[in-house]
Design a protein with these regions (language model features):
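Conserved catalytic cores of phosphodiester-cleaving nucleases, focusing on short active-site segments
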Residues: 433, 455-472, 486
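Phosphate-binding site recognition
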Residues: 1-425, 440
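Metal-dependent nuclease catalytic cores in nucleic-acid-processing enzymes
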Residues: 178-185, 338-346, 434-438, 442, ...
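Mg2+/Mn2+-dependent nuclease catalytic core
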Residues: 168-173, 472-489
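Structural motif
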Residues: 148, 464-466, 500
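Domain-level recognition of nuclease-like catalytic cores that cleave nucleotide substrates
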Residues: 491, 497-521
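Active-site metal-binding core of divalent-cation-utilizing nuclease and nuclease-like domains
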Residues: 139-143, 436-462
């Protein structure tokens, strides 16, 4: 294994610990400079889980506490000359998940307690909102400096109960009450920074803080969290080379693998490409490209949303959404797509100015394969090892250029799940094949749609490109004819690889493949 040049902060989200421990820190302090130069005061930022929000919040805390020594060599060191120490109140709401009303109130009180030890507690301050207001005012009076309030993962107590109407209303009232003093505390506040995954529109921080700037979809802040390609190829270049050595890849090949697996996040109309920092850091540290972020768990609220809205896997990447869809509170959503975007399972692929709509899609292979594997038991075999076995064996046959063996394996698999295919229509058949071929993207390149359209599946192997066209109660000959008539092979004629056309017909009466034809391109 090649030696790792950098120390990677796996599991560390505190700016102080990263800097003092000499861990790799990707400098995001230019964004703090931007906030201060623009005199921005109330800011909201939405990003997916484990995407660097907490680290940025911690960086802000250290800055406003005047911790000059932690910022040596960073962008902000050239800007800041005074390093004023402000009283900072940092509330981490990620610890308030899965709570009932009574437990949530207790949690808020415990969050306030350390600050009351610093600045005292006023008589009659019983409820969390009263206590918050009191400590901010006393801090201002005692220090002579306005306060900074940082609320990280503000929506964490609410997301897991978003589909529990009564519980949601109770917890929302508690949180609304807690955040309510922020507006009237304006004269005592220097800066307020709030992070979360989504936007609960009826919470007071949005309904009352009319000067709250939501920077989540601004181009200039698209890379405020996560790691850009420029950042990867500068501060992490030696370790990309080391990872390539470990995987038997050149530097450019390794960079491409990382891009395909972890890059592709876009958070605005003209966003930079952003890598998932959680996965990228673990890949560098462990010198292996694995499913780190997706494998760390799918939130229960997201699973419930997928069930509630009956999401079809083929629709996920085809429907557009508008800016208004992003602003809908989770409990008022009529589609799972905005929540899938906010949670990091979809990202912006394109912006269409004419309709002012956003085309969403999977950001990268890690998320695409993870989502398809999670959803496949609803359409294919409920036993995931059956599905994975089909995919790997099919690909093995293709590597051996044994297309007959691959098709016979697919036919046998479809026969084994024929009961799940009974009373299904052509759309269901298309979904089954969509899943099977896209799951192969974990191992080989599966083509996306091109300008001239696409065949049902295009599978790229090192020496051969296979183009599949599927028919439902038609004929394999018609499928081959469509490949020729539509010119599906044209984009690959200059590849230098062997081209193979495969026409397939699905027989609905037998509930499996009826026939197939194979011809060289």
């Amino acid at each position: 294994m090649a030696k790792i040049v950098n120390f990677y902060p796996v599991g560390i989200q505190t700016f102080e610990n990263i800097r003092e421990g000499n861990y790799l820190y990707v400098d995001k302090t230019k964004y703090i400079v931007n906030f201060r130069e623009k005199k921005m005061k109330f800011i909201f930022l939405s990003r997916p889980r484990r995407f660097g929000k907490s680290l940025f919040a911690s960086t802000l805390q250290a800055y406003f506490e005047g911790r000059k020594e932690l910022f040596e060599g960073l962008a902000i060191a050239e800007y800041e000359k005074e390093w004023v120490k402000y009283p900072v109140f940092h509330f981490d709401m990620s610890g308030a998940k899965h709570m009932d009303a009574e437990t949530l109130v207790s949690y808020l009180n415990l969050e306030l307690l350390p600050y009351e030890k610093l600045y005292g507690k006023g008589e009659g301050e019983t409820y969390p909102n009263e206590r918050l207001e009191g400590i901010v005012k006393r801090a201002y009076k005692q220090t002579g400096q306005k306060a900074v309030v940082i609320i990280d993962e503000y929506d964490a107590p609410l997301l897991d109960v978003v589909h529990e109407k009564d519980n949601l209303q109770q917890l929302r009232r508690i949180m609304q009450n807690f955040y309510s003093p922020l507006k009237k505390l304006d004269p005592y506040l220097e800066f307020v920074f709030i992070t979360g995954i989504t936007k609960f529109s009826q919470l007071s921080i949005f309904s009352e803080l009319n000067n709250l700037e939501n920077i989540s979809m601004f181009d200039q802040y698209s890379a405020i969290c996560g790691i850009s390609m420029t950042e990867l190829t500068s501060v992490m270049k030696p370790d990309v080379e080391g990872l390539g050595d470990a995987l038997g890849l050149t530097y450019d090949e390794c960079l491409e693998e990382l891009r395909l697996y972890y890059d592709g996040y876009h958070f605005s109309k003209h966003s930079e490409d952003v890598f998932n920092p959680f996965s990228l850091i673990r890949a560098m540290n462990g010198q292996a490209i694995e499913s780190y972020w997706f494998g760390s768990g799918t939130p229960s609220y997201l699973i419930k949303s997928l069930q509630k809205y009956h999401v079809n896997v083929m629709d996920i990447e085809t429907k557009g959404v508008t800016i208004d869809d992003f602003d809908v509170s989770p409990e008022q959503m009529t589609s799972a797509l905005p929540l899938l975007y906010q949670s990091g399972y979809l990202t912006i692929k394109a912006y269409k100015p004419l309709t002012k709509s956003y085309q969403l899609g999977y950001p990268n292979n890690e998320v695409r394969i993870g989502m398809l594997r999670s959803l496949s038991p609803n359409y294919l075999s409920p036993v995931s090892t059956d599905n994975n076995g089909l995919v790997t064996e099919f690909i093995d046959f293709l590597y051996d250029e044994n297309i007959e063996g691959a098709m016979n394996r697919l036919k046998a698999y479809l026969s084994s799940i024929s009961n799940r295919l009974s009373n299904k229509n052509e759309r269901d058949f298309q979904t089954v094949f969509y899943l099977i071929f896209n799951l192969m993207g974990a191992f080989i390149k599966v083509e996306e749609e091109s300008a001239i359209g696409r065949a049902d599946a295009v599978l790229q192997l090192p020496n051969t490109i296979y183009v599949f066209e599927l028919k439902y109660d038609g004929s394999a000959e018609d499928a081959l004819r469509q490949i020729d008539d539509k010119g599906y092979l044209i984009p690959y004629t200059a590849s230098g690889k062997k081209l193979v056309k495969v026409g397939v017909n699905y027989d609905s009466t037998q509930r499996t493949i009826g026939e197939w034809l194979i011809r060289k391109g």
